[in-house]
Every structure is written in C-alpha cells, then in structure tokens.
Amino acid sequence: MQTNELLDKIFRGARSQNGWLPTPVPDSKLRELYDLMKFGPTSVNCSPARLVFVRTEEGREKLRPALAPGNVEKTMAAPVVAIVGYDTRFYEQLPDLFPHNPAVKAWFEGDEKVDFANTTAFRNGTLQGGYLIAAARALGLDCGPMSGFNNQAIDQAFFAGTSIRSNFICGLGHGDPEKVFARSPRLSFEQACQLA
C-alpha cells in the first residue's frame, strides 16, 4: 500500500461510525489489533491501557445501563465495543517493562505520588487509546469512539475491585456507510498551531 493510501485509510478517509454492518470481528483480529497497538510509545514504557473487548450479549447487557441514551442503539449494534481503561497501579509492571532502570517503580509508588501516578496512567492510557484507533483502521476495521457514558457505572460493572478506571469506549467492526454523518470541519493549521 502506498503512503497516501495508508494515510487515507487511517486518517483522511476514515470516519467515526454511527452504525454497523452485522459482520463479526474474530478474536484473532482483536489479538492482532492489540499486538500492533502495544508498540506505540508511552512514558518509561508504562503501558497503562487495559482493554475489555465486549462482544457477547452478556457483556453488552452489562454495558447498556452505563450508556447515554443517544449512544445505546449504535453501541449495542457494534460487533465489538472496546472499553479503553487505564491501570492506576501500572507501575507494578515497570520492573518487567522498563528493566534497565530498577528504580523506576519508586517514581510512582506511595501516597504522596498518587496524583502523579494517576496523571501518568490517564495520559499514557489515552495515548494508547489513540494507537488502538489507528491500528484498528490500519487493519481494516472501522471505529466509533465515544465518551457518552457513565464512567462510574462502567468501572463498577467491569473493573470493580481493581485499580483500573475507564477512559472511553470505541465500537469496532465494519461501519454502515449509510449512517455516517457528513464530515464536520476541522481547525486550520493557523487556528490550532503556533510556531515558536
């Protein structure tokens, strides 16, 4: 695939989906997706993202009460819904993930460092959520990311008793082109950027 084709597939031609075709996404594709997105960079390789791929009726029914009313239909229709979370105790894995600095875990441990650890987890987990979307599109999947849901309800349903918190959710599958909205405007370089 040529560079422009790939950029179109991931960015310029890709659209946030509002409806889905009933084409299943096999578990092997979800593994391939994770095995690609995990290579995106994070601070000290902290890799705090934690994912739940909701694909069963039981999982959907756990998810349903947390959704904003306007998001229920499209979310329930998605072949897979990824709950993109982040582990606030990500640093427990750092001895394995960042082995050349044995002291790195201590940067985040302790009551006085909770805010720093939480900020690091949220920031880098969000980065990884972006990598998830780019990787999914590169693999031929469409995405429908959204934040119209109750985080506390999702955390209770899927992450109770853990140090994982939800960030956003993202439908994955093959979008229904009939349900895609017209592309909204984007800010120009001059509106969004400065050269210093």
Swiss-Prot record:
Signal peptide: none annotated. PANTHER family: MALONIC SEMIALDEHYDE REDUCTASE RUTE-RELATED. It is an enzyme of class 1 (oxidoreductase). SUPFAM superfamilies: FMN-dependent nitroreductase-like. Its cofactor is FMN. Its EC number is 1.-.-.-. This is Putative NADH dehydrogenase/NAD(P)H nitroreductase Reut_A1586. CDD domains: RutE-like (cd02148). InterPro entries: Nitroreductase, Nitroreductase-like, Nitroreductase_HadB/RutE, RutE-like. It holds the Pfam family Nitroreductase. Keywords: Flavoprotein, FMN, NAD, NADP, Oxidoreductase. It comes from the Bacteria. The keyword Transmembrane helix does not apply. One of its GO terms (molecular function) is oxidoreductase activity. Belongs to the nitroreductase family. HadB/RutE subfamily.
